[in-house]
UniProtKB/Swiss-Prot annotation:
<dbReference type="GO" id="GO:0003677">
    <property type="term" value="F:DNA binding"/>
</dbReference>
<keyword id="KW-0238">DNA-binding</keyword>
<dbReference type="Pfam" id="PF20772">
    <property type="entry name" value="TACO1_YebC_N"/>
</dbReference>
<dbReference type="InterPro" id="IPR017856">
    <property type="entry name" value="Integrase-like_N"/>
</dbReference>
<dbReference type="InterPro" id="IPR002876">
    <property type="entry name" value="Transcrip_reg_TACO1-like"/>
</dbReference>
<keyword id="KW-0963">Cytoplasm</keyword>
<dbReference type="Pfam" id="PF01709">
    <property type="entry name" value="Transcrip_reg"/>
</dbReference>
<feature type="compositionally biased region" description="Basic residues">
    <location>
        <begin position="1"/>
        <end position="14"/>
    </location>
</feature>
<dbReference type="InterPro" id="IPR049083">
    <property type="entry name" value="TACO1_YebC_N"/>
</dbReference>
<protein>
    <recommendedName>
        <fullName>Probable transcriptional regulatory protein Aflv_0709</fullName>
    </recommendedName>
</protein>
<keyword id="KW-0804">Transcription</keyword>
<keyword id="KW-0805">Transcription regulation</keyword>
<dbReference type="GO" id="GO:0005829">
    <property type="term" value="C:cytosol"/>
</dbReference>
<dbReference type="InterPro" id="IPR029072">
    <property type="entry name" value="YebC-like"/>
</dbReference>
<dbReference type="InterPro" id="IPR048300">
    <property type="entry name" value="TACO1_YebC-like_2nd/3rd_dom"/>
</dbReference>
<feature type="region of interest" description="Disordered">
    <location>
        <begin position="1"/>
        <end position="21"/>
    </location>
</feature>
<dbReference type="InterPro" id="IPR026564">
    <property type="entry name" value="Transcrip_reg_TACO1-like_dom3"/>
</dbReference>
């Protein structure tokens, strides 16, 4: 992971989301709805819902939107059934791609994802064809701007909180945890006064791929096309983050 800052990828994703805020809120509301429907509407006892709410708040989603999604999921009205589906494949130049969807129509979603890959030099594969190239980890990113702590002290606090490792970039401290320790580390650091640019359980590539020219152009178009799909919740890939600048 060394040298591959997640900060650029996060910034790009947030900038793209800012430009499509209505679509983003719809996707976040769907995630909250599914979490509340599956595990109940109380975030203190539903960890999946708690993480979905925190994710929505970090995107500045209004509280009334969050509450509406929970109420819809826990009310007596007819429910929409969403199914989580994971698609795996390769983008141009052999970039590994995983696409996580929440859909009420598997045929529509499969068709849209397949078209996005085929139009941009990629190929969908079987389940498991690229997931082994990623590790599921907690990621906590703390921006270094206006932060008065050096790398050694930050590393010590992160490790004492239960983190596995930390990377330092020019812009940020990037703290990695096991999925099981994620909430403990996040809550401990928050109690110490740290605020987070992002805090999520995500998929971290084991290795990275660099692209140039037409392959890079097509890969960026593939990411954009998938992000525009209402059914797509998350896109994980191992394109080198420097390619996203």
């Amino acid at each position: 992971m060394a040298g591959h800052s997640k900060w650029k990828n996060i910034q790009r994703r947030k900038n793209a989301q800012d430009a499509k805020r209505g679509k983003l809120f719809m996707k976040l509301a769907k995630e909250i709805y599914v979490a509340a429907k599956m595990g109940g509407g109380d975030p203190t006892t539903n960890a999946t819902l708690r993480l979905a709410i925190e994710k929505a708040k970090s995107a500045n989603m209004p509280n009334e939107n969050i509450e509406r999604a929970i109420k819809k999921a826990t009310g007596n009205q007819e429910h929409t059934h969403y199914e989580e589906i994971r698609y795996e494949g390769y983008g141009p130049g052999g970039v590994a791609v995983m696409v996580i969807c929440l859909t009420d129509n598997k045929n529509r979603t499969a068709s849209n994802v397949r078209v996005a890959f085929s139009k941009n030099g990629g190929n969908l594969g079987e389940t498991g064809c690229v997931s082994y190239l990623f590790d599921r980890k907690g990621l906590i990113v703390i921006a270094r701007e206006n932060l008065h702590i050096d790398e050694d002290d930050m590393l010590l606090q992160a490790i004492e909180a239960g983190a596995d490792e930390m990377e330092t970039t020019e812009d940020s401290f990037e703290i990695y945890t096991s999925p099981e320790q994620f909430e403990q580390v996040k809550n401990t650091l928050a109690a110490q006064g740290f605020t987070f640019a992002t805090a999520e359980i995500t998929m971290i590539p084991q290795t990275y791929t660099t692209l140039t020219g037409d392959d890079l152009t097509k890969m960026l178009k593939l990411i954009d096309m998938l992000e525009d799909d209402d059914d797509v919740q998350e896109i994980y890939h191992n394109l080198d983050e420097s390619m996203l600048e």
